Every structure is written in structure tokens, then in C-alpha cells.
């Protein structure tokens, strides 16, 4: 079991680092293109953003977006994206595209109802502070919500289904995953790599290889009162003792954890 978990962890870390490199490369391409092309699309607080829109004020969708490129790129702080019941549909999980990109800005909220489907990352936030995602259906992406270098992110009341990873946080702090629903995300419902001071609470996670995974460099996280039905429900650094990671576990209804003793037992 330990050898199998170690191989799984190495595969997960490779995937996350590869996705980070590819997506950051695309972000750089976007920035360079905007500075060189005078007729790039920018949306200033209007309804009806289109694929590839760079938004500088709060925006509402007025139709579905079917994109062969990135969906929406946020270029300012203190704004919101209202999905208004519409969908952002991408070119597939093998692409390097994201439904919504939030790079190096603060206080951005994406709220539904709405759906983001068929991207490498449904929502990708890098270097940002106070990103909120609520009431969004993220399905058939490689990663539903991908946070890297982010702080104070709040993810609530979302449904994530048929992704490889529902939520993936890399080198982030103060992530809150609260009352989200995860179904059949193949690798993990929630994955933390080098992520700490975060809370995972009141989530329902079903049908993954690992329900919740934290690596050895993820410290001081509070993981409590989640309901899990997965191959491995809670995987803390492939079995590293909790007194080393300083992660706190309370009231999690599940059957199998690494190390043992975290689960309370699933009720029928």
C-alpha cells in the first residue's frame, strides 16, 4: 500500500507541476499578445463577455460561451463574475485552456448558478488574494478549481464531478472548502500540495482514488465533519503521523484513512 501511494503521489505532483507550467506559459502569451495587438478584446463592466475576454470590471454572462481558447481573463481587483445560469464550455481537458483565469489580483468573486466544463482548469487562480467561488457546477475538466500561490480563497456550495481533481491547491494558504459536493473525480476530490492554514469542512466527497489528499509539506490544516466514500477517504501524506503535519481531524465520516484512526465510520 505504501509503495502504491508513493507512486500515486509522484504522479499527482508531476501532473500539477506540468499543468502549472503550461498554464503560466499561456498567461504570459496572453499578456504579450495584449501588449502587441491593439484590437484585443476587453470588457468593461458590461454583459455578454465573449471567449478570451479580458475583464476590468464586474461582468455578467448573457449567453453560453463555447470556447476554443481561454474563457474569461480577470485583469482587475474588486470585481465579480455572475454566471447567470449560463455555461462556459471549453475545448477539452487535454487543452492548456482555463474557463476563468484570475492572475495576481485581489477580491474576485465568481458566482452561479452556472457551469464550467471541458477545460484543463475550470477556474485557475494564481498569486491572487480573496478569490471566492460559489454555486458553480464544474465537470469534465482536468481540475475543477486550481489555486497556486493563492491566499484567503473561499470555495462554497459548488458541485465538482468527473474531473481528475475537484480542487487542487499548490503553495497556497487560508483556503476554505465548505459545503461542496464532489462526485467521481478520478484522482482526488481535494488535493493540497504545500498548502497550509486552511479548512476543509462539511464537504461530501464520493468516488475518488483519494477523497482528501495532503502532502508532507501541507501543515496546520483543519479537516472536519466531511462525509467521504472513496478508495482512500483521507490520505495524510501517505500515512505520515498527524503530530508531524499538525493537521487537525475531527468528526469525519469515512472508512479508510492514512494514517488510520482519522475516520469515525460511515453510517448507512
Q: For each of these PLM feature ranges, what is it?
A:
Residues 29-47, 248-256:
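Short, polar/proline-rich extracytoplasmic segments that appear immediately after membrane translocation
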Residues 71-73, 97-101, 122-124, 142-145, ...:
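Structural detector of coil-to-beta-strand junctions
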Residues 1-36:
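Sec-dependent, cleavable N-terminal signal peptides
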Residues 214-268:
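Leucine-rich solenoid repeat scaffolds
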Residues 37-62, 66-75, 263, 268:
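Acidic Gly/Asp/Thr-rich repetitive segments characteristic of extracellular carbohydrate-active
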Residues 83-86, 109-116, 135-137, 145, ...:
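Extracellular beta-strand-rich, repetitive "passenger/adhesive" scaffolds
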Residues 54, 66-81, 90-109, 118-129, ...:
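Extracellular beta-strand-rich solenoid/capping regions of secreted or surface-exposed proteins
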Amino acid at each position: 500500500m505504501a509503495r502504491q501511494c508513493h507512486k500515486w503521489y509522484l504522479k499527482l505532483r508531476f501532473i500539477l507541476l506540468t499543468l502549472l507550467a503550461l498554464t503560466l506559459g499561456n498567461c504570459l502569451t496572453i499578456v504579450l499578445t495584449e501588449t502587441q495587438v491593439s484590437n484585443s478584446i476587453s470588457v468593461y463592466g458590461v454583459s455578454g463577455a465573449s471567449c478570451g475576454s479580458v475583464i476590468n470590471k464586474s461582468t455578467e454572462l448573457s449567453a453560453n460561451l463555447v470556447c476554443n481558447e481561454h474563457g474569461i481573463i480577470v485583469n482587475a481587483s474588486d470585481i465579480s463574475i455572475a454566471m447567470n445560469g449560463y455555461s462556459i464550455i471549453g475545448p477539452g481537458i487535454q487543452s492548456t485552456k482555463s474557463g476563468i483565469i484570475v492572475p495576481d489580483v485581489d477580491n474576485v468573486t465568481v458566482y452561479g448558478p452556472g457551469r464550467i466544463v471541458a477545460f484543463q482548469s475550470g477556474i485557475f487562480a494564481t498569486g491572487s488574494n480573496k478569490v471566492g467561488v460559489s454555486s458553480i457546477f464544474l465537470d469534465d475538466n482536468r481540475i475543477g478549481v486550481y489555486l497556486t500561490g493563492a491566499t484567503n480563497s473561499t470555495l462554497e456550495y459548488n458541485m465538482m464531478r468527473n474531473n481528475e481533481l475537484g480542487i487542487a491547491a499548490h503553495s497556497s494558504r487560508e483556503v476554505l472548502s465548505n459545503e461542496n459536493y464532489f462526485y467521481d473525480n478520478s484522482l482526488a476530490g481535494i488535493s493540497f500540495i504545500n498548502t497550509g492554514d486552511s479548512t476543509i469542512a462539511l464537504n461530501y466527497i464520493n468516488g475518488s482514488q483519494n477523497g482528501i489528499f495532503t502532502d508532507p509539506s501541507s501543515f496546520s490544516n483543519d479537516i472536519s465533519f466531511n462525509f467521504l466514500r472513496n478508495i482512500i477517504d483521507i490520505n495524510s501524506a501517505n500515512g505520515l503521523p498527524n503530530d508531524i503535519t499538525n493537521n487537525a481531524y475531527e468528526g469525519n465520516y469515512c472508512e479508510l484513512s492514512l494514517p488510520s484512526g482519522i475516520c469515525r465510520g460511515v453510517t448507512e
